[in-house]
Amino acid sequence: MTSKLDQLREITTVVADTGDIEAVARLKPVDCTTNPSIVLKALGTPMFADAIKEAVAWGKKQGGNPDAVSSAVADRLAISVGAALVKLVPGRVSTEVDADLSFDTEASLAKARSIIAAYKDRGIDRDRILIKLASTWEGIRAAEVLQKEGIDCNLTLLFSKAQAIACADAKVFLISPFVGRILDWYKKSTGKDYTAEEDPGVISVREIYNYYKANDIKTIVMGASFRNAGEIEALAGCDRLTISPALLDELSKDDGKLERKLSPESRKPDAKVSVDEKTFRWMMNEDAMATEKLAEGIRAFAKDLTTLRTMVQKELQLAAA
């Protein structure tokens, strides 16, 4: 029998949401996605011990403000994780712009360009990388500019149709609408359990997928943030799905039949609209779940980024002793 993972690969591009080199080599995804949490976890493994030593040695040679040096070394380490993953996948690796820049378009642009330049220094072309930005108004504006420069973007922490519409208006390459974190919010809010078909996160991604296909929007829809295999199965046929190694393993061991749930041919009419800034902010204001989960996600990624920079500072201090 063919596993559900292999059946899924026939209709959806499978992406691994991890920095685990061993898991990527074993599971053979097309792409990989990373974020500050994933980078931090990867750097805690022996695989990246030499990369940490190299980055710290590089940092020691840099002059200037210690905080700026720590930040630069942290960036270098994130690129090291991404560069290792690029060697293992035929497609792209997503590297995230600092979460604490989520409300600063110009700073996000500068950081994105520096990420692309850092990869180029390692012989990795921009067509192997996706720049991840939070789906704030400012992040979407940065992506709009980057796309015109030939730098493809992955808009993350996306919880609402308003964000998806704004991303479509900006002609971004790919969006990552979240599933599991939406479910978390509704379970906490209502105290209910949900089947996969009732799952508010699944319903959200299906609505966004349908809107894009109904209006011939070329932006790729990549469902993200899964709590269980049922959510993944309920989105079978989505353009791409980025999945943790644990859930990829679960799907690889299940020989049941996988039914396609999404396809461009099954789209229903959904009138195309555009959003300006005030409309976007109002729609977000009216969506408590999207507002809260976006803010929470930015805070969590910023916290992990701070943890990484603190680790770097300690390593630099030890190296200087």
From Swiss-Prot:
Pathway connected to this protein: Carbohydrate degradation; pentose phosphate pathway; D-glyceraldehyde 3-phosphate and beta-D-fructose 6-phosphate from D-ribose 5-phosphate and D-xylulose 5-phosphate (non-oxidative stage): step 2/3
Broad class of the protein's primary localization: cytoplasm
Subcellular localization(s) per the UniProt record: Cytoplasm
Keywords assigned by UniProt, alphabetized: Cytoplasm, Pentose shunt, Schiff base, Transferase
Catalytic residues identified in the record: 132
Record-linked PROSITE patterns: TRANSALDOLASE_1, TRANSALDOLASE_2
GO molecular function: transaldolase activity
Listed Gene3D superfamilies: Aldolase class I
Subunit (UniProt): Homodimer.
Function: Transaldolase is important for the balance of metabolites in the pentose-phosphate pathway.
Name the record gives this protein: Transaldolase
UniProt source species: Rhizobium etli (strain ATCC 51251 / DSM 11541 / JCM 21823 / NBRC 15573 / CFN 42)
